[in-house]
Amino acid sequence: MHVFAAVFHLRLLSRSLKGKRGIVKSILARARNNFNVAAAEVDLQDVHGEAVLGFVTVSGSRVEARKTLEKLEERLVEERPDVDVVSVDIEEV
C-alpha cells in the first residue's frame, strides 16, 4: 500500500474571504468526488487571495497514486481559470 500526499499552493481571484471559501469548497468537493482523495485547506485560511490545499490518496500501486494527484493538478488548471497554481509538492508518505 502506497500513500501519497500533495500540497497545492494556489493564488485565487477572490476579493473576500467569503469568495475564497466558495472557490476552495468547490475545489475540495470536486477532488473528493472525482478523484477519491482526502482533501482539506491546510494553511492561509485568513488570506483571501491565496490558499494552501492538501490532498492524500492511497493505492496499491505507487505509479497509480502519483498519477491520481498529477491528474488532479491537470484538471484544476483546465477547469478553474480563477485559480493560479503557484506550486505543487507531491511526495510519498
Locate the predicted segments by residue.
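A general secondary-structure signal for short beta-strands and their flanking turns/coil
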Residues: M1-A5, H48-E50
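Active-site-flanking beta-strand signature of metal-NTP-handling nucleotidyl enzymes
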Residues: F4-L10, G54
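Beta-strand elements of well-folded, non-transmembrane domains
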Residues: L10-S14, N33, S59
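Short beta-strand elements
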Residues: N36-D43, V83-D89
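C-terminal structural segments of small proteins and small subunits
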Residues: T57-V93
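C-terminal binding/interaction regions
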Residues: K20
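Short, charge-patterned binding micro-sites
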Residues: E41-S61, E92
